[in-house]
Amino acid sequence: MTPIRHLVLSAFLLAFCVPAHALDLTGLEAIPVQEGGRKKPFLVFADESLLSLTGKSAHTKDGIKLGPVVTVASLWLTPVGWEDQPLVLIGNKKFKDHLGLDPSKKLFTYRELATNEKLRAALQEVSAIRAKNPKTSLDTLQREASTVGMRLAVFEGLVSGRSDTLLPTGAAAWSPLGSGDSALAKLREGFMSDDQATFDAGLALLRGEQAGQEPRFQADPGKIAIEVFYQNLHPFRWAWILYLLAGVTLLVLPGRAGYVLGWAFALAGFLIQVVGFVLRIVISGRAPVTNMYESVVWVAFGTILFALFFEAIYRSRYFLLGATPVAVASLILADTQPVILDSAIHPLVPVLADNFWLTTHVLTITLSYAAFALALGVGHIILGKTIIGSKVSPALNNYLYRTLQIGVLLLAIGTILGGVWANYSWGRFWDWDPKETWALIALLAYLFLLHGRVAGK
């Protein structure tokens, strides 16, 4: 099997992966939980918790691969024995050596870490540093200790039930189910005995308890349903699969048939990305460019957007051939590296929320990155042709120039909008701080490149 076919097949298997468990936990997926400053479905809470703990969206126990919902539900409802399951991620080899752990392993049990004296000392050191000055920079090992401590706290919160804040209480924070709660007792009984009727009865009791609270403290059922749909859809995974098919089709199938089919795959991927962004906007109530994950996905989207725009004008496959590798690489990175790129939807701090100028500034600047990413792709096509001794047509050079023009235009507008945002927020348009200075330097460098091409004629 070729690497490309293997990659596509793996993506399909990931998209349709069904967690193994005797009970149908679909009803639990849509139960609202308050965590991380917002209300979210249990499905999302479970996925984010397991990613935070293990760096993966699934856990293998006794040779059986378990999805996030069944894993987190088991930690919550049947916690006995989980302290001996390798669940806590430690990725830094030096830190593992420091703790005397097996450097070839990535996951460790709660018990072996909780009883590790060197880890305890490292956590006490970090705590003392933070108590003295919360802004003090930590070294690599101290940062790793802090991260491991956070993961241990996640585990403790799950097995104790403290993290499963399911009940609106009329206050800002929701509460976990009490040990004597009838819904919790039914859920636990049904889960332990694989009794679907008892488990569903527990869910019904829990929904009744949630519905009995004041409406203004409850989660919006429509938003919860939309987020469950989004979480199960994996739109950005499907987008990179379709972009990959588009790029391969354009590369190996010459002629009009290959061009039309490649166009169709790229357009389908683009549209499913649009669906993904619309869903994230509805869920979060803001523009989808507030962290590195969203920025990477947005740049991939913009790269295909500009490629389709130029293809509609020039009818040349070079734009899509240049855009698809960039988009595929970006989306695969976002899809497969959750520890590096956190896909969780977080609420914005008040100073950044509901700020029109900040939103337009960030969207415009990141779209300029997309145009430059397309220029990168087209530029590599030119380099490839030059290396193999193939003639580079003037039209191809012109395509590269056009993509750079779009990037420079958007970068200039975005830089100006950044000044407008600064003036709106802090009362000054330009202050020559490092970020502003380097934004101007980047713009001037690209302007020099564009004008230098004309001067060289």
For each feature predicted by the language model, list its residue ranges:
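N-terminal secretory signal peptides that target proteins for export/translocation
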Residues: 1-4
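Short hydrophobic alpha-helical segments that form membrane-spanning helices or hydrophobic packing faces
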Residues: 43-49, 298-299, 368, 440-441
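Core alpha-helical transmembrane segments of integral membrane proteins
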Residues: 218-328, 334-337, 344-347
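Bacterial N-terminal signal peptides
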Residues: 6-17
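Hydrophobic membrane-targeting alpha-helices
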Residues: 15-20, 254, 277, 308, ...
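Generic detector of multi-pass transmembrane helix bundles and their immediately adjacent loops
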Residues: 303-457
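Membrane-interface interhelical loops and short amphipathic "cap" helices
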Residues: 31-33, 209-233, 275-296, 338-363, ...
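Soluble extramembrane regions of membrane proteins in the secretory/endomembrane system
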Residues: 20-229
